[in-house]
Amino acid sequence: MLQTNNYSLVLLIQLALLTFDLFVNSFSELLRSAPVIQLVLFIIQDIGILFNVIIILLMMFNTYVFQVGLVSLLLERFRAMLILSALYLTLSICFHCWVMNLRWMESNRFVWTDGLQVLFVFQRIAAVLYYYFYKRTTEYLGDPRLYEDSPWLRDAFARARQ
């Protein structure tokens, strides 16, 4: 079971990773003259997104709902967040690779092609949705009812057995 002090630490780590992600999305263009630093920030950002997904999955695996075998209930509840996380990670990696490929040798050259601008917009929209759904999922996974036996869980288990 996730204890209150453990949940606070996990929540702090998740929010720190989300804040770093937001920081890189907001200010990475200011570092275009230093492509190595920008590359390192992009790599750390992608690893942070991956860590956030792993943390959410571990929190899901830790719930009583998962332990009694109602995985479908969790997947139904968190499907949007899991899909958005995968989409956001994919769009971020694609955007980072494309920008670094175009900008590596000539960092002050205008590299914003039409395709890159479209990818940029989709990546940023996915980022906003990812932040919202991730934070909502994190708060929902802090609900103590997910970590103990309860009447609604017994009803869900009975429906799943039929």
From Swiss-Prot:
Subcellular locations according to the entry: Vacuole membrane; Cell projection, Cilium
Superkingdom of the organism of origin: Eukaryota
Topology in the lipid bilayer: Multi-pass membrane protein
Classification via Pfam families: TMEM138
Lineage, uppermost ranks: Eukaryota, Metazoa, Chordata, Craniata, Vertebrata
Glycosylation sites: 6
UniProt GO cellular component terms: cilium; vacuolar membrane
Main location: membrane
Protein task: Required for ciliogenesis.
GN (gene name): tmem138
Record's keyword terms, sorted: Cell projection, Cilium, Cilium biogenesis/degradation, Glycoprotein, Membrane, Transmembrane, Transmembrane helix, Vacuole
Protein name: Transmembrane protein 138
